[in-house]
From Swiss-Prot:
Database matches in PANTHER family: TRANSPOSASE INSH FOR INSERTION SEQUENCE ELEMENT IS5A-RELATED
Transmembrane segments: none
Function: Involved in the transposition of the insertion sequence IS5.
DNA-binding found in the keyword field: yes
Family as reported in the entry's similarity comment: Belongs to the transposase 11 family.
Protein's recorded name: Transposase InsH for insertion sequence element IS5H
InterPro entries: Transpos_IS5, Transposase_11, Transposase_InsH_N
Entry keywords, A to Z: DNA recombination, DNA-binding, Transposable element, Transposition
NCBIfam families the record matches: transpos_IS5_4 (NF033581)
Gene Ontology cellular component terms for the protein in this record: cytosol
GO molecular function per UniProt: DNA binding; transposase activity
GO BP of this protein: DNA transposition
Length: 326
């Protein structure tokens, strides 16, 4: 397939001012280890035969990444390839040849879902980051967030997604699923991910979020009682778990007397703060606020891809911070 630019594309690429989208895509172009990612998918990707020749695997992977960065449906991604030159160039496509349609884009996503390849990409990228010395093992921060799912029954099946559930947080009811993550305390990179229905208690998945080499685990008050859990009895770590809000309020009524205890809570909170970074990236930077698909498997595939890309985005942030300070 030709990567030659059309007249319109070349005119676009020679513009002086770079847009925010161009700058972002340029950074992602450099930080993503494309060959490592392609090697994960290649054994499952259709080979050129007698029928219609498939698009290059890396092109489809680049399109898939852009779908997650910009929270685009298959149809919206197809439109973007026609309308936005910077996205077309990033995918190594040109208007002088056919562009992938929404069905082709959807089929690539289904391929990743069918073989759980987003999970494999998550592991591959984390191994690559660990080998690069970015991901450490000393401490793990754990947290969970509720992700809303459409609660309407006005669909083909006339029912809500049976794999999603309702749960109450504070005074509000939520319907959907929950993403549980284990995060490297040093870098803020996500090393573990578990997807469940929203009504799953955070503590139930704690053991699945630990890699086994950490010396301490930090968590909010929702994880109180973790050291007493039978399945965590063999876990030899320092537990830095926040006290319940009511107890903290009581301590603050006598600040002088409880100064040490209050300072310990502040210390726990400062250590724990980095666990919010991955959620902030996927929600605010990538715009992911609601489950797009039906069923936990498809949504787990999307979340695994989102956290893979969030780790690479975070690694890029760390590199740029280092460059500014040197």
């Amino acid at each position: 397939m030709s990567h030659q630019l059309t007249f319109a594309d070349s005119e676009f690429s020679s513009k002086r001012r770079q847009t925010r989208k161009e700058i972002f895509l340029s950074r992602m172009e450099q930080i993503l280890p494309w060959q490592n990612m392609v090697e994960v998918i290649e054994p499952f990707y259709p080979k050129a035969g007698n029928g219609r020749r498939p698009y290059p695997l890396e092109t489809m992977l680049r399109i898939h990444c852009m779908q997650h960065w910009y929270n685009l449906s298959d149809g919206a991604m197809e439109d973007a390839l026609y309308e936005i030159a910077s996205m077309r160039l990033f995918a190594r496509l040109s208007l002088d040849s056919a562009l992938p349609d929404r069905t082709t884009i959807m089929n690539f996503r289904h391929l990743l879902e069918q073989h759980q390849l987003a999970r494999q990409l998550f592991k591959t990228i984390n191994r690559w980051l660990a080998e690069a010395g970015v991901m450490m093992t000393q401490g793990t921060l754990v947290d969970a967030t509720i992700i809303e799912a459409p609660s309407s029954t006005k669909n083909k099946e006339q029912q809500r997604d049976p794999e999603m559930h309702q749960t109450k947080k504070g005074n509000q009811w939520h319907f959907g699923m929950k993403a549980h993550i284990g995060v490297d305390a040093k870098s803020g990179l996500t090393h573990s991910l578990v997807t469940t229905a929203a009504n799953e208690h955070d503590l139930n998945q704690l053991g699945n979020l630990l890699h086994g080499e950490e010396q301490f685990v930090s968590a909010d008050a929702g994880y109180q009682g973790a050291p007493q859990r039978e399945e965590l009895a063999e876990v030899d770590v320092d537990w830095l778990i926040a006290e319940r809000p009511g107890k903290v309020r009581t301590l603050k009524q006598h600040p002088r007397k409880n100064k040490t205890a209050i300072n310990i809570e502040y210390m726990k909170a400062s250590i724990r703060a980095k666990v919010e970074h991955p959620f902030r990236i996927i929600k605010r930077q990538f715009g992911f606020v609601k489950a797009r698909y039906k069923g936990l498997l498809k949504n787990d595939n999307q979340l695994a891809m989102l956290f893979t890309l969030a780790n690479l985005f975070r690694a890029d942030q760390m590199i740029r911070q280092w460059e500014r300070s040197h």
